[in-house]
Structures are given as structure tokens and as C-alpha cells.
């Protein structure tokens, strides 16, 4: 599957155009296969399918949307099974949970250990994982006495320029 073509134009939401996981579908699958092989983990058909659903859609999906897609593809649509797969993929850095949307998204940078940061359009619900170095924003964990931070996730909510333009012409 090829990457989506970038939109041209002065007022498009560039951060979402640049996102699309920075790799094509096949590259993402190859990365996860290599990781599982290197770590001696099983890339079961169910784990593969859940990851394919998330990487294919390039958007956050709720657990029940993932369950529906699994059911359509002939897999078990049992919530406990799906949540175990999602937890496993999150543990290994291939999926992130977007708390503000109660949804899951494939990681755009799975080969690097990082604390993810996301921008979320509250109008169109597009989500982009942003890179700390490229954005110029520092996500450094604060040094808090008597507390060890295990994970930091930053979610910034606003309205993208595309949604702003649609709002001006009452498309929402």
C-alpha cells in the first residue's frame, strides 16, 4: 500500500500530511516482523491483523472499531483477546493509546525508544505523533523528588487549519 499523496495548498494542516507514519504499509510490517524475530516473540495472525488494521487506517481507532474490523476479517471479536493484543503491541512500542480519544494508533517511530507526543484535532479527530526534535518542543521529564517517572505521554488538543477552514464554511 502506498503512502497517501500530500495535499498541496497554503492552508492545509501540514503536521497531518507529514504524519502518515513516515513509512509505507509494507515497511511497517517488515519492521515489526524483524523486531519479533529478533526478540524471539510470536507475531501471531491476530497480532498481525490488529497491527495491520491500525497501520492501514493511519488514524486512531477505538477498541470496538478494531473488534468490528477483526470480525469482518474472520477473527475472534472477543474484547479480552483484542485488549491483550493491544496491550502486547503497546508494551513493545508498536501501538500507542490516545487517552483523550480512548483510541489506539500505530506508532510512527517504532524503532526508537521515546515518550510519544500527539496533536489531536478536536473537530476532525485527526491525530499526529510529533517528533520532539523536529517540533522544537521539549518533552523532557521533570525531575521530581521521590518519584520515578516510567512513562510520559503528551496530548495537545486544538483545531487544525483544515478543520478551521471547514468550520468557516459551515462544513461541520
Across the structure, where does each feature detected by a protein language model lie?
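Short capping segments at the starts of secondary-structure elements
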Residues: 43, 57-62
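Basic amphipathic alpha-helical segments that dock to polyanions
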Residues: 54, 82-92
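N-terminal leader segment of winged-helix/HTH proteins
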Residues: 1-40
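Pre-recognition alpha-helix immediately N-terminal to the DNA-recognition helix
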Residues: 48-53
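A short acidic, leucine-rich amphipathic alpha-helix
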Residues: 65-71, 82
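Non-DNA-binding regulatory cores of transcription-related proteins
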Residues: 91-172
Amino acid at each position: 500500500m502506498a503512502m497517501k499523496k500530500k495535499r498541496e495548498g497554503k492552508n492545509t494542516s501540514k503536521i497531518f500530511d507529514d504524519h502518515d507514519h513516515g513509512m509505507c504499509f509494507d515497511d511497517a510490517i517488515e519492521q515489526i516482523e524483524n523486531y519479533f524475530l529478533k526478540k524471539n516473540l510470536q507475531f501471531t495472525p491476530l497480532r498481525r491483523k490488529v497491527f495491520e488494521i491500525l497501520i492501514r487506517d493511519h488514524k486512531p481507532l477505538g477498541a470496538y472499531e478494531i473488534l468490528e474490523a477483526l470480525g469482518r476479517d474472520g477473527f475472534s471479536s472477543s474484547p479480552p483477546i483484542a485488549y491483550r493484543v493491544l496491550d502486547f503491541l503497546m508494551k513493545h512500542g508498536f501501538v500507542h493509546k490516545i487517552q483523550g480519544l480512548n483510541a489506539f494508533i500505530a506508532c510512527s517511530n517504532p524503532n526508537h525508544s521515546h515518550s510519544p507526543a500527539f496533536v489531536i484535532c478536536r473537530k476532525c479527530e485527526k491525530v499526529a505523533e510529533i517528533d520532539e526534535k523536529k517540533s522544537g518542543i521539549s518533552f523532557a521529564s521533570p525531575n521530581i523528588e521521590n518519584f520515578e517517572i516510567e512513562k510520559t505521554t503528551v496530548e495537545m488538543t486544538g483545531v487544525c487549519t483544515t478543520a478551521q477552514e471547514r468550520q468557516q464554511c459551515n462544513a461541520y
